[in-house]
Amino acid sequence: MASVALSEAEKVYIVHGVQEDLRVDGRGCEDYRCVEVETDVVSNTSGSARVKLGHTDILVGVKAEMGTPKLEKPNEGYLEFFVDCSANATPEFEGRGGDDLGTEIANTLYRIFNNKSSVDLRSLCISPREHCWVLYVDVLLLECGGNLFDAISIAVKAALFNTRIPRVRVLEDEEGAKDIELSDDPYDCIRLSVENVPCIVTLCKIGCRHVVDATLQEEACSLASLLVSVTSKGVVTCMRKVGKGSLDPESIFEMMESSKRVGKVLHVSLQSLLHKEESLGPKRPRVGFLG
């Protein structure tokens, strides 16, 4: 993960500011930076989104392809995650430098979506035990400016919201052989419900307090962070600690309560933004180099 070198004086300045609920950039401990979200940015995908959170820039593309259901879940489709850490994001990712981080992020996403409530996987089933939709979710890290996991989870949810899956019909001939027919109408498609798709809220312990949406400088002052996956209703679906430091039970409880509080607000803002952007239709202004 991208890192930054700080002097002891800079670390003390950041820690003391957090103690007073006044961070270096003027935010409070539970405030996010400005989040920019744009969907439908990659033309050859079933759905896509780009998210900028401060200096963190994430691009997510979703590709729907037909596959075979897993043996243990014959009536469901499934999601596959791949994370690419671009060398443009930070020199540390050159060569195979970002492989470990990419694997860690992908495994975290698998844990978040490894339940029946996040996404209705049954809606991805075409023919039990034979055919289903497989959603390949590709995440590209364009720039790292702190708080990667939160930005990625927001981008994944936005991309799934934007995903259109072609409607299919299963036809059966007189001999019982099945044939799959895709609709010729590009607007005849199904969409996933993302209401229960969780977002990650990362809380970094700095001194005796914790902050959300930490910058690279703040992450350098933290020895332990808690990643909490929260739904729009404030339900925690996944939690893991990262970093070399430890967290006492009281801190974990406080951080979980903060994540629920912050997560609800984050979901409301994101859903409002996504619906507002969609209401603009194809005439909405394109921004960024992908526009």
UniProtKB/Swiss-Prot annotation:
In this UniProt entry, the residues modified to N-acetylalanine are A2
Cite a GO CC annotation.
nucleus
Keywords (alphabetical) are: Acetylation, Cytoplasm, Exosome, Nucleus, RNA-binding, rRNA processing
Matching entries from InterPro entries are given as:
ExoRNase_PH_dom1 (IPR001247), ExoRNase_PH_dom2 (IPR015847), ExoRNase_PH_dom2_sf (IPR036345), Exosome_comp_Rrp42_subfam (IPR050590), PNPase/RNase_PH_dom_sf (IPR027408), Ribosomal_Su5_D2-typ_SF (IPR020568)
PTM-bearing positions, type N6-acetyllysine: K116
Question: Which SUPFAM superfamilies does the record match to this protein?
Answer: Ribonuclease PH domain 2-like, Ribosomal protein S5 domain 2-like
Q: Which Pfam families match?
A: RNase_PH (PF01138), RNase_PH_C (PF03725)
Q: Which terms in the Gene Ontology molecular function aspect does this entry carry?
A: RNA binding
Kindly indicate whether the keyword Secreted belongs to this entry.
no
Question: Any idea what job this protein has?
Answer: Non-catalytic component of the RNA exosome complex which has 3'->5' exoribonuclease activity and participates in a multitude of cellular RNA processing and degradation events. In the nucleus, the RNA exosome complex is involved in proper maturation of stable RNA species such as rRNA, snRNA and snoRNA, in the elimination of RNA processing by-products and non-coding 'pervasive' transcripts, such as antisense RNA species and promoter-upstream transcripts (PROMPTs), and of mRNAs with processing defects, thereby limiting or excluding their export to the cytoplasm.
What is the official name of this protein in its record?
Answer: Exosome complex exonuclease RRP42
Kindly list the organism's lineage: Eukaryota, Metazoa, Chordata, Craniata, Vertebrata
Q: Which gene encodes it?
A: Exosc7
